[in-house]
A protein has these predicted regions:
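Contiguous segments within soluble domain cores/interaction surfaces
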Residues: 1-90, 94, 100-101, 105-115
Length: 115
């Protein structure tokens, strides 16, 4: 389950991680960027209750997610920019995304649970 603050950038919520594939549990992650913020976004993450990695992308290949400034290919009609992708972890547990943009940095803590 994801507990997100509704700031400038946030993911979709309440989605369980899918069964492991190649040692990674995957979560389809759709990021929303508020119309009031048009700058770049950097998303990183890690497990916070013990050691553990997090990866991003369509497969667990990236150590971070970058949402470029300006319009996205699939911008919503209400002006929100969206960035689809995935978040991957090795084990269920407590994790956090760190979301950075120009003038802000926030942490979003979530519990990675399985289906």
């Amino acid at each position: 389950m994801v507990f997100a603050t509704l700031g400038s950038v946030h993911p979709a919520q309440d989605i369980p991680f899918e069964s492991p594939r190649d040692g990674w549990y995957g979560l389809k992650t759709l990021w929303f960027v508020a119309p009031s913020y048009q700058g770049p976004v950097l998303v990183r993450g890690a497990r916070i209750d013990t050691e553990g990695a997090m990866a991003f992308g369509e497969s667990p290949a990236l150590g971070e997610l970058i949402i470029p400034p300006g319009p996205t290919l699939n911008e919503a009609s209400d002006g929100y920019r969206t960035a689809p992708g995935g978040t991957y972890v090795h084990d269920p547990g407590c994790y956090a995304w760190q979301v950075d943009g120009i003038g802000f940095s926030t942490h979003i803590v979530f519990s990675a649970t399985t289906v």
